[in-house]
Amino acid sequence: MARKLFCQLSPFCYRISVEKEIMLRNLRDLISPVRFAEHREEEPLPALIKGHRSPMLRQLAGVDMQLQYNKETNLRLAGERIHGLIIEPGQTFSFWHTVGRTTARKGYLPGLTIGAGRLGAETGGGLC
């Protein structure tokens, strides 16, 4: 029998592993020479270089439609954090650095997630 990873022992151990990885990423970001975009402009820029539209709601087989409605909320909340962000030369855009953790306390709702080849629902789901 193959030895299990610590994160596979229980949901609690999985959570500890996730928190460890987040902490390591934050430490790497702190000491990294990468400069993340953080400056925001409230006024719209004078030119639109690229625009894109996608349908937000899709009826998926075997998926509760409420998860699609929640996705709209999650995208709106994340969009508010990204809106107006200026990426200057030499800077890097990081979705997760800009948006941060998607928690219920911040208003994020359960949305559709895909992990390990399975559909699920997690707070902040639907952003990818």
Give the role of each language-model region.
Residues M1-L127:
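Well-ordered beta-sheet/strand-loop patches within structured domains
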